[in-house]
A protein has these predicted regions:
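Intrinsically disordered, metal-sensing/regulatory segments
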Residues: 4-284
Length: 284
C-alpha cells in the first residue's frame, strides 16, 4: 500500500527544502494487463458517454430554427464550463505538484492562448475549404468540437490514470463514475451542428472516437508515466481548443440569422448549458 514520506534536500549553506508525499508507492510497470485495464476505463469514461450523447441527433434534426439556435447556444454553455474546468484542474496541479520555477499560472495562460490561436487558424482554413475537401460546414464545426472535447478527455484520462497508479482506489472510482456521467453531455455538443447536415453512421462513430478515445491514451500516460508538467500542458491545450470552438459556434449562430446573439434562444441556451454542467458536477 502507498505510504506517506517526507523528502528533504539540504544545500551547502544549511538551507533545507522539504516536500511531503502523501502516498508514495511503486510506479506501475507497463504490461498488457494494466494497458487493457486502462483501455476499458478510458472507453467507459470517454467513448461510451459521448456515443450516448450523440443519440440526441434524431431529435435535434426535427426542431425549428429558434430551437436549433437554443441547442447551439446550449453547446456553448457546455463547452464554456469544460474550458473553465480544464483551467481549474491545471491550476490545482500547479498548486499541488509543480515547482514554482515553472511559473505555473503564466504557463497555463501562455499555453491556452497559443492553443487557441493555433487551432483557430486551423479551423478557419478548414471551414474556408469545405467545398474543395468535400466536407460540409456543419461537419467541419463538429470535427473541431470533437477535437476540443478529445483534448479535454485526455486530461481527464491523465487524472484517472494517476489516481489508479497511486493506489487511490476510492478516489479513482469517484473520478471514473463522475467523469462518465459528466461526459454524456459532450455528445450533445457534437450532435447540435451535425443536425443540419447529413452525417453517416461512420462519421458519427469517427467523431465519437475523436472525442472519447483520448481518455484511453490519457489513462495510459497518467498511469504509467504521470508528469505534472505535461498534465498542465495538455489541460491548458484542451482549454484553448474549447474556447476556440466556442468562437466558431458563435460565428455559426450569427450566420444562421441571430446577428447580435441577443435572442432569448441564444441567452437561455448558454445559461442552460452552464447550469447542466454545474449540476452534474455537484451531484456526482
Amino acid at each position: 500500500e502507498a505510504e506517506p514520506y517526507i523528502i528533504g534536500l539540504t544545500i551547502d549553506d544549511g538551507t533545507r527544502f522539504e516536500r511531503e508525499i502523501e502516498a508514495a508507492a511503486p510506479a506501475l510497470k507497463p504490461d498488457l494487463e494494466f494497458a487493457g485495464f486502462f483501455a476499458i476505463i478510458g472507453t467507459y469514461v470517454g467513448i461510451i458517454p459521448v456515443m450516448i450523447g450523440l443519440l440526441w441527433l434524431p431529435f435535434i434534426k426535427k426542431i425549428s430554427k429558434s430551437k436549433y439556435h437554443f441547442f447551439l447556444a446550449l453547446t456553448i454553455g457546455l463547452l464554456l464550463f469544460l474550458g473553465i474546468d480544464s483551467i481549474e484542474e491545471a491550476i490545482d496541479v500547479v498548486d499541488e505538484n509543480l515547482s514554482g520555477s515553472f511559473n505555473g499560472n503564466l504557463l497555463i495562460a501562455t499555453t491556452v492562448i497559443l492553443s487557441f490561436l493555433g487551432l483557430y487558424y486551423t479551423s478557419e482554413k478548414l471551414t474556408s475549404r469545405v467545398d474543395s475537401i468535400r466536407i460540409s460546414k456543419p461537419a467541419a464545426i463538429a470535427l473541431m468540437i470533437s477535437i476540443g472535447i478529445g483534448l479535454h478527455n485526455f486530461g481527464e484520462g491523465l487524472a484517472i490514470g494517476a489516481a489508479v497508479g497511486l493506489g487511490s482506489i476510492a478516489f479513482s472510482t469517484f473520478l471514473i463514475v463522475g467523469f462518465a456521467l459528466h461526459n454524456t453531455t459532450e455528445g450533445l455538443a457534437i450532435a447540435a451542428p451535425l443536425s443540419r447536415g447529413k452525417p453517416t453512421i461512420g462519421k458519427l462513430l469517427g467523431l465519437g472516437l475523436i472525442a472519447g478515445a483520448p481518455a484511453i491514451f490519457g489513462a495510459w500516460v497518467g498511469g504509467f508515466a504521470f508528469s505534472p508538467f505535461s498534465s498542465v500542458i495538455f489541460l491548458s491545450i484542451g482549454a484553448g481548443a474549447i474556447f476556440q470552438v466556442i468562437v466558431i459556434i458563435l460565428k455559426w449562430i450569427r450566420e444562421e440569422g441571430d446577428s447580435n446573439l441577443s435572442s432569448a434562444a441564444a441567452a437561455s441556451g448558454i445559461a442552460t448549458g452552464l447550469l447542466i454542467m454545474y449540476l452534474t458536477s455537484i451531484i456526482i
